[in-house]
From Swiss-Prot:
Annotated positions of the Phosphoserine modification: S470, S472, S863, S864, S920, S922, S1442
GO MF term (any one): DNA binding
The family this protein is said to belong to: Belongs to the AF4 family.
Listed InterPro entries: AF4/FMR2, AF4/FMR2_CHD, HMGI/Y_DNA-bd_CS
Keywords on record: Developmental protein, DNA-binding, Nucleus, Pair-rule protein, Phosphoprotein, Transcription, Transcription regulation
GO CC field: nucleus; super elongation complex
Species name: Drosophila pseudoobscura pseudoobscura
DNA-binding region, residue intervals: 900-912
Protein's recorded name: AF4/FMR2 family member lilli
Region (Disordered): 1-28, 134-327, 402-660, 761-805, 822-1173, 1291-1390, 1483-1502, 1656-1683
Subcellular location: Nucleus
Chain intervals with Basic residues compositional bias: 511-520, 844-854
Role: Has a role in transcriptional regulation. Acts in parallel with the Ras/MAPK and the PI3K/PKB pathways in the control of cell identity and cellular growth. Essential for regulation of the cytoskeleton and cell growth but not for cell proliferation or growth rate. Required specifically for the microtubule-based basal transport of lipid droplets. Plays a partially redundant function downstream of Raf in cell fate specification in the developing eye. Pair-rule protein that regulates embryonic cellularization, gastrulation and segmentation.
Record lineage: Eukaryota, Metazoa, Ecdysozoa, Arthropoda, Hexapoda
């Protein structure tokens, strides 16, 4: 011990004589001289060899770093072997150089290894100590023992490995020094063995004897025998987390060893250079930067030389340790040092560091190095002096130095010894006591060991280290203290280990900074009492660890914490590694704590192998992060880490799976963010939208976040979130900011590491919140809208989210405006709500604002919002944001409604809303569940909600929702139109009459969309004159939300509003707003509706609170709707040409909208409908139901509805009856999802609707009996007074809402409730039963309606309608014919939901006919009634209404319904259109909204059957998001799900999680395809294909199993095959250009016949003909053609490319066969109906939506088998 102390003193003196105390320096010098002499005598030969090797290594420090990184694995082997060898052959330089410290494969293994390793170290230590006592040779002989002195001798070799290398090398060169070094090394030896053993790998198995086997000679390549050749990351699992640190430390140590060995032996005099270079194997390159950045950067000891000399300082610090040579001290050291196993266990997560630290049995040795770098008094004094002042910073420095030296964990801690008491406390609480006991003389050594433990912990928490980088402040402090204490040591040690250890220490130091500081001070005092101090430190460190562990005690909390850390900056892979390695316990906790601040460093660390461990140091030094020649696998984020393929390829590219935790939010080196799957933030599958972003844009971010968090917690975040991955980041943002104090260090996080630091943080924070609660539900956490269907979340207060099982938080977020906000507008008054120019923030918000706003505002408006044209949507978003205040003002009137719509609804709604999308609407509403987010993103994207409507229609119409769609469309139209009118920010005509005239202009569009929804009509009528204005509004021109406050029927409406205050009342408010937007709705009807619905949405949300206001709104809406209706028919005639032109013009916008919406809401988008798109249509239906239910539950409202219906009596009764019947049919098959969404709306804005839903489906469907209809119509006239302006339109709107709403609402309502799904299934069953009856009725009604329509067309009033009819359907006859055909077809394809569409169209036709028959007054009354009764529905239907208008235009396409429906009112056509045409109809419908003209153009409904299909050209590619944050979040989500699946025990959950991960990878690849290089995209696609193939092979046995899950597994397998097929096709497409070139080249080659023909027996002309060999071989050569190598290569490539094409088709066919053989046609048919068919032309976002929707359905089936069975029976 005395010798060790002397060595330490000498080394310290050599390294930092100026820093060491004079006495210590003198003693060290003297001792070193003596020891060097002895060592020279004993090791002259070794020194010579070592000097040469060390010189080479010294020259190749950089090489050594890389080499060490490569050798890291080799070192592992060697360490294993060397443990034995060193124990037996410690003096052998090579053997000693090979640190055979055991590596931990897992945390458990780490514990075992730590115990064994420490035991081995203990033996080595005893041998060294005892031998050292008897002779200095053991120290000298033992490279590790010797190594420590050289670092001290070599001011630069701070790492134990370099020290040991230098020690052994210089042991012979400097016998005296090596003796003292040996003693110190004995202390360090174990530490070095621990620290250097990994570097011991450095000594290559490649028998290069000259250099202690530390690292190759400079020129020698570091051979990585171990596959994970990134020396940075030890292959073993636990070490990986620490591997960054360890590998850094190892590579540093190896390089340090090489430098120390070669340099120390050869250049012991070079000591400082060697230590500098050695520690640097990395530090050499980062000699200055690592130390400065980590410690010198802290500025405490800026001079790298100081850092070089800290070895000397450490030697000085170790002067007290020489007494430690005493047996008692040795024993105590052994006891304490080797006891470190316990801390190591807690630090198990940081295998390398813990192992090394464990092996660094002598903390003093580490302290020696630490002191050497610090250049302060002997370890004992130095820790106190340096560590006391700089304690936190010093500890980090020491650890970095240590890592840079030999085994960064040990060495860095050793070098940090004095400075790293904190680190030891953190990582090595157990060890320091042991070390202290053993090394009482070297108190610093003990702290160093503690530091080692800390280093271990830090390395264990490599992520934590990186995360610590995030906590740059703490780490900087640590750096500062390190710089002061370890300025020189920090150079190497800091670079490699300071990142991991210092940041890790920083974590602990942050927590234990004071403790560590005290420890440093104590160490000064405890130099004499080092054992006690070590024990205290150990205890304190353990306490700290315990505290940390307490914090991390719960995995959830740990995850949360680590999430926060990672979010803070731990987002980096290192951070992820740390997070993943929570096993480190206290260390992990500390690391996590520092992670936020150190995350930046970690992030940079993740960039390089060294960066992972030194990433923290990178934060401090910034050099370590990129310095990692071989980044730890944790730094490699390429998908390969997620796939079986090795992640060694590019150190910067791939992060080893062990290092990166998918469960921990973080940022991969490429900037990709890993967001824990459990994060619920991605509630809706919003393609590129973030619900949270929308909310944020809508200023509802907080609300949204809260809602989403609630949903996450309550629902555990279903995976259904769909594409809106970024919302996680957004949601996380809050939590990250709130929960991550570590974020203070974020500034240090490298931008390259965190592309989206804020988002990563947010996602991490949120992830931490939801990750803990929802980690279990990782797969489901992404979609809050996918919350358990049976789970009914009580509606929260205003601003909170109504958590509905199937609806995303954003949608359900009820922007509860207090009733005061929903003050009813005075009757006959126009409420103008100024809307900020939408263009201000149109596009960005287009996705987010709407989303957020819808989430905030009443969900009901989702569908209405969908209907708004994209421009309107955009305007809506802007208006939502700009008119947020306006909404507050007009909330009572209109704005709330708009909000909801803005969400995800628009897409689907536009898809289904426009074309009688009841079924589509239900699909849309389900899609809206996730759609709100999508819509929010897509709405802006798709400026034509018509697109969304058409898309919806594509979904539902393709799903044969023609019949369903019409009904739904009607309902939607009513509610939507109303909602839209309210929300539409437009220069709306102030009064009803003006609206009527305006409606005339917008009447076509109004008809399209308003026929389906009275609200829509009303809004159109009010905005018909402002239709162009609306368009402008859509264009974000100055907009005012014009609310027609017609309260002529206020009392009745009030009743209705009271009845349907939640649904109808809100609908009424929506209607009021809808009427203004209705005119502009035509193309922009969706937009207007969108805008309107945004405002009314708030109202709807408010309405439940203020039913009275709602009823007023209902009245207003109803009047608006009525006027819209009337205006549609009346002014529609006048403005037909104009409207048609507008529509045609709008068609383009609609097409754009449709295209966008199609992309957004494409059924393939994976449940846009399911995931939170709320189809207002449902509310309309619900409103109808409300009418029925109100009559039953609330007599007065029902009477009001009856009055309105009386107006509608001739046709409406039939229509209503048909609607009731039709709606059931519609909602039957694919609308479960939609129903959920719709229910969401109803729940948000209508309470009575729920009551109505309580009614049996049959009651709801047929609730309005003819008598009831008559009664309602009778009552209706009183209300029509209010809506007298648009009677015709009112008719259409009213029927639609009445028709679809009852059943859809019932179904949706049911879905919202736990039993709702069952109810929905029952409803579907009843609907199926009723379908036959309804079909019969519908047929008759359709005939009657056709007749009526013909009459109306003939009539002057019906002239325009005729135009519509003619436009919709070429002629009444054609319409009738089409209706009949469609009815028959629907009936035939009853199972396919076609029957439902038929019923709906029939109802629509009947209604339309009735409406046409009815006078405008009647229509107005009916419309008002519909608006009043379905006030809430109006809000919902308003959005749908816009689509309805579009759909109406397209309705001609649907044979029976369209032909009949379109002419009378856009309602029927829209229904049909929706059902038939998904996207194109919306555009066409919008164009047709003009009325006849568009209708006529669309009129050729010849493709009656085609109506169910959408044109291939209707689907436009979704606008790609350039938001890298979202792209990163996709990757994070994918990684999280992949990791969650890895740890999942249930086979079904595992396979679904894997498949979810795959589709998220596909989203990532899709986004990369637009932003990254083709090669990167190719790689991720190829890796994803490998992953999915692996998954498929893994779960193949389950497909044949006879257990109940084999069918579900088969369905998942089919989805998997589809994905594989599309990925294969994508791989071909990515190489299509290359393939074309290759084919052309090969074609030319074969055409020209180039190439020499070789006869079978003709000897080669190359060799002599006499050549026996040539003859012999030639004689056996078959005849053939010599193909040039180039051609052969091209043939190989061609084969590869064409194999992808072949595989794509083979896999697709295989999936089709499985569908048929497994009798899964119904399942996939329903999926196609709801989400659009999945084809080989589908885009990745569509694949994502489709697969997500399918997996959600399967999950629901598994979790609710009874409901599923019920559904099947239905």
């Amino acid at each position: 011990m005395a010798q060790q102390q002397q060595q330490q003193q000498q080394q310290q003196h050599l390294q930092h004589p100026h820093q060491n105390t004079n006495s210590n320096n003198q003693l060290q010098q003297q001792q070193q001289q003596l020891q060097l002499q002895l060592q020279l005598q004993l090791q002259e030969q070794q020194e010579q060899q070592q000097q040469q090797l060390q010189l080479q290594q010294y020259n190749n420090n950089f090489y050594s770093q890389n080499y060490n990184m490569e050798e890291y694995e080799r070192r592992k082997r060697r360490e294993r072997e060397k443990i034995e060898r060193q124990q037996g052959i410690q003096i052998d330089d090579r053997e000693t150089a090979l640190f055979s410290e055991p590596r931990r494969l897992t945390e458990g293994d780490a514990e075992i290894t730590a115990a064994l390793g420490e035991f081995g170290d203990a033996r080595v230590y005893i041998n060294q100590s005892t031998v050292g006592i008897s002779r200095h040779a053991p120290g000298a002989g033992n490279p590790r023992l010797q190594a420590p002195p050289p670092p001290k001798t070599l001011g630069h070799s701070h790492s134990p490995s370099s020290s040991s290398a230098a020690g052994s090398g210089s042991g012979s060169a400097l016998p005296g020094q090596s003796q003292s070094q040996q003693q110190q090394q004995k202390q360090h030896y174990q530490q070095q063995q621990q620290q250097q053993r990994p570097p011991g790998y450095l000594k290559q198995a490649d028998n290069k004897p000259p250099y202690n086997g530390r690292g190759g000679y400079p020129g020698q390549p570091m051979k990585n025998d171990i596959p994970s050749s990134s020396g940075m990351a030890p292959p073993r699992g636990p070490p990986r987390s620490g591997s960054g640190s360890i590998s850094n430390s190892n590579s540093n140590s190896s390089s340090a060893t090489n430098n120390a060995t070669g340099g120390a032996a050869g250049t012991t005099p070079l000591g400082p250079p060697l230590s500098t270079q050695m520690p640097n194997g990395r530090e050499k390159s980062f000699l200055g930067p690592p130390a400065p950045a980590l410690h010198n950067g802290a500025g405490l000891f800026v001079p790298p030389a100081a850092s070089k000399r800290p070895g000397g300082g450490s030697g000085a610090g170790l002067q007290p340790p020489p007494p430690e040579k005493d047996i008692t001290k040795m024993i105590s050291e052994m006891t304490n040092s080797f006891r470190v196993t316990a801390p190591l266990t807690s630090i198990a997560a940081t295998p390398h560091a813990p192992t090394r630290e464990n092996y660094n049995l002598n903390g003093p040795n580490t302290n020696k190095y630490a002191f050497g770098p610090i250049g302060s008094p002997p370890i004992g004094s130095q820790p106190s002096s340096l560590m006391a002042p700089l304690f936190a910073p010093i500890a980090p420095i020491a650890s970095p130095i240590t890592s840079l030296l030999t085994t960064p964990p040990h060495a860095s801690q050793g070098s940090l010894g004095g400075a790293s008491p904190v680190a030891p406390l953190q990582q090595l609480p157990p060890t320091p006591p042991k070390a202290a006991a053993a090394l009482s003389p070297t108190a610093a050594a003990k702290p160093l060991k503690t530091e080692k433990n800390h280093t271990l912990e830090k390395q264990d928490s490599c992520l934590e280290n990186d995360l610590e980088l995030s906590e740059s402040e703490d780490e900087q402090r640590k750096k500062e203290s390190r710089s002061a204490g370890n300025s020189s040591n920090s150079s190497e040690s800091d670079s490699s280990e300071s990142g991991s250890e210092s940041s890790s220490k920083g974590d602990h130091q942050q927590q234990h900074h004071h403790h560590n500081h005290h420890h440093q001070q104590q160490q000064q005092q405890l130099q004499q009492q080092q054992q006690q101090q070590l024990l205290q430190q150990k205890q304190q460190h353990q306490q700290i660890l315990q505290q940390q562990q307490r914090q991390l005690t719960a995995n959830g909390s740990k995850k949360k914490y680590s999430h926060s850390i990672i979010a803070g900056g731990g987002s980096t892979i290192s951070g992820l590694l740390t997070s993943s390695g929570f096993g480190s316990g206290g260390a992990g906790n500390g690391g996590c704590s520092t992670a936020s601040s150190g995350g930046g460093g970690g992030g940079s660390g993740s960039g390089g192998g060294s960066g992972s461990s030194s990433g923290i140091g990178t934060m401090s030094s910034g050099s370590s992060s990129n310095k990692t020649p071989s980044p730890t696998e944790s730094n490699k984020w390429t998908l390969s880490r997620f796939f079986p393929k090795p992640a060694n390829q590019t150190s910067s590219e791939s992060v080893s799976p062990g290092n990166v935790s998918m469960k921990v939010p973080g940022i991969l080196p490429g900037g990709a963010q890993i967001i824990p799957e459990s994060i619920e933030v991605t509630t809706a599958i919003v393609k590129n939208e973030k619900i949270h972003d929308d909310h944020m844009d809508m200023d509802e971010v907080e609300e949204e976040d809260e809602d989403e968090e609630q949903l996450q917690q309550q629902q555990q975040l279903r995976y259904g979130a769909g594409l809106s991955v970024t919302p996680v980041a957004v949601a996380v943002k809050k939590e990250a900011l709130d929960g991550v104090g570590e974020m203070g260090g974020l500034p240090a996080i490298p931008k390259n590491q965190i592309k989206r630091e804020a988002e990563a943080l947010h996602s991490a924070a949120r992830l931490s919140d939801s990750g803990t609660s929802g980690s279990g539900s990782t797969s489901s956490s992404s979609s809050s809208s996918d919350s358990a269907p049976g789970e009914v979340v009580p509606m929260p207060g205003p601003g909170e989210t109504l958590q509905l099982p199937g609806v995303p938080a954003a949608i359900t977020t009820v922007m509860r405006v207090h009733p005061t906000l929903m003050q009813k507008a005075p009757p006959n008054s126009v409420t103008l709500t100024p809307i900020l120019p939408l263009p201000a923030s149109p596009k960005q918000r287009q996705k987010k604002p709407r989303k957020k706003k819808p989430a905030t505002s009443a969900p009901i408006l989702d569908s209405s919002d969908d209907d708004d044209p994209p421009a309107a949507k955009h305007a809506l978003e802007l208006s939502a944001a700009a008119a947020a205040a306006a909404q507050a003002q007009a909330t009572a009137t209109v704005p709330p409604l708009a909000v909801k719509k803005g969400r995800g609804r628009p897409r689907k709604q536009q898809q289904s809303g426009g074309s009688g999308n009841l079924s589509s609407a239900s699909a849309g509403s389900s899609s809206q569940t996730k759609g709100p987010t999508l819509t929010a993103a897509k709405k802006p994207l798709v400026k034509g909600p018509a697109m969304a409507n058409s898309r919806k229609r594509d979904h539902s119409s393709q799903s044969s929702s023609n019949g369903n769609t019409p009904t739904k469309k009607l309902a939607m139209g009513t509610g939507t139109g109303t909602g839209t009118a309210m929300a539409v920010p437009m220069t709306v005509i102030p009064s009803g009459p003006a609206n009527a005239s305006a409606v005339a202009a917008a009447s076509s569009s109004s008809d399209e969309d308003s026929s389906s929804s009275t609200g829509s009509t009303g809004s159109k009528s009010s905005s018909s004159s402002s239709s162009s204005d609306d368009t402008e509004t859509t264009q974000n021109t100055k907009c005012r939300i014009v609310k027609l406050n017609k309260t002529g029927a206020v009392p009745p409406l009030a009743r209705l509003g009271a009845v349907a205050s939640a649904g109808a009342g809100a609908g009424a408010g929506a209607s009021g707003s809808s009427s203004p937007s209705s005119s502009s709705s035509e193309p922009e009807d969706h937009l207007a509706m969108s805008t309107v619905s945004a405002l009314p949405m708030a109202q709807q949300l408010m309405q439940p609170y203020k039913p009275r206001a709602v009823s007023q709104h209902s009245q207003q809406l109803s009047s608006s709707e009525c006027s819209s209706s009337s205006g549609s028919s009346t002014s529609g005639d006048e403005d037909e040409a104009k409207r048609e032109k507008e529509r045609e013009r709008k068609r383009k916008s609609d097409k754009n909208k449709i295209s966008t919406l199609t992309r957004i809401f494409n059924p393939k988008e994976g449940g846009a409908k399911k995931q939170g798109q709320v189809v207002i249509m449902d509310q309309s239906e619900e409103q109808q139901q409300v009418k029925v239910g109100d009559s039953s539950s609330q007599p007065v409202p029902v009477q009001n509805a009856a009055i309105a219906k009386l107006r509608m009596t001739p046709t409406q009764q039939q229509q209503q009856l048909g609607a009731g019947l039709a709606s059931p049919a519609r909602t039957t098959t694919p609308h479960l999802t939609s129903l959920i969404c719709k229910i969401d709306l109803s729940k948000l804005s209508r309470e009575r609707i729920m009551r109505l839903k309580k009614l049996t489906p049959s009651q709801q469907n047929g609730h309005l009996t003819p008598k009831d209809l008559v009664t309602i119509q009778t009552q209706g006239p009183s209300q029509p007074v209010q809506g007298h302006l648009l009677p015709a339109k009112v008719k259409h709107e009213h029927p639609h809402p009445v028709k679809p709403e009852p059943e859809l609402d019932a179904g949706y309502e049911s879905k919202f409730k736990p039993g709702n799904v069952k109810q929905e299934f029952q409803l579907k069953q009843e609907r199926d039963r009723e379908r036959e009856r309804e079909r019969d009725r519908d047929r008759e009604r359709e005939r009657e309606r056709e007749r009526d329509r013909e009459r109306e067309r003939e009539q002057p009033t019906g002239g325009r309608r005729r135009k519509r009819s003619s436009s919709s359907s070429s002629s009444p006859y054609k319409e009738k014919k089409r209706k009949k055909e469609k009815s028959d077809h629907l009936q035939i394809s009853k199972d396919q939901l076609l029957p439902v569409p038929v019923l709906l169209p029939s109802n629509n036709h009947e209604r339309i006919s009735c409406h046409e028959r009815l006078s405008f007054d009647k229509l107005q009354l009916l419309h008002e009634d519909a608006a009043a009764v379905a006030a809430a529905a109006a809000a919902v239907s308003a959005p749908n209404g816009s689509p309805s208008k579009k759909l109406l235009v397209m309705s001609p396409l649907p044979p029976p319904p369209t032909a009949v429906v379109v002419p009378p009112a856009v309602v029927a056509p829209s229904t049909c259109s929706e059902a038939v045409q998904t996207t194109p109809p919306s555009a066409a419908a919008t164009a047709t909204a003009a009325t006849s003209t568009t209708g006529t153009s669309t009129a050729p409904p010849a493709p009656v059957t085609r109506l169910i299909y959408r044109s291939y050209f209707d689907r436009e590619e979704e606008p790609h998001s350039d938001d890298h944050r979202k792209n990163n979040q996709f990757l994070v989500e994918a990684v999280n799900r992949k990791h969650a699946a890895d740890s999942e025990r249930d086979s079904f959950n595992q396979v679904t999680l894997y498949l979810e991960a795959v589709v998220y990878f596909l989203l990532t690849a899709d986004s990369m395809e637009r932003s990254s290089s083709e090669q990167a995209t190719w790689t991720i696609y190829k890796d994803t294909l490998s992953l999915i193939k692996f998954i498929s092979s893994k779960f193949r046995p389950y497909q044949q199993s006879t257990n109940g899950q084999h069918e579900t597994h088969n369905k998942v397998a089919i989805l998997s095959l589809r994905c594989q097929s599309l990925i294969s096709l994508k791989l071909y497409k990515l190489r299509r250009t290359n393939c074309r070139t290759v084919i052309n080249s090969l074609t030319e080659f074969f055409r020209t016949g180039r190439g020499d023909i070789v006869n079978g027996n003709t000897p080669s002309s190359i060799s002599p003909s006499n050549s026996v060999g040539s003859q012999g071989s030639g004689s056996n050569t078959p005849p053939g053609k010599i193909v040039p190598q180039e051609i052969h290569t091209q043939l190989s490539k061609q084969n590869e490319y064409l194999t992808y094409v072949n595989s794509a088709h083979e896999l697709w066919d295989q999936a089709d066969r499985l569908v048929r053989t497994g009798n899964h046609i119904d399942f996939f048919r329903e999926l196609d109906h709801e989400n659009g068919p999945l084809t080989l032309h589908s885009t990745m976002p569509e694949v994502f939506r489709y697969v997500q929707a399918g997996l959600k359905t399967l999950r629901d089936a598994v979790s609710h088998p009874t409901q599923q069975t019920l559904h099947q029976s239905h």
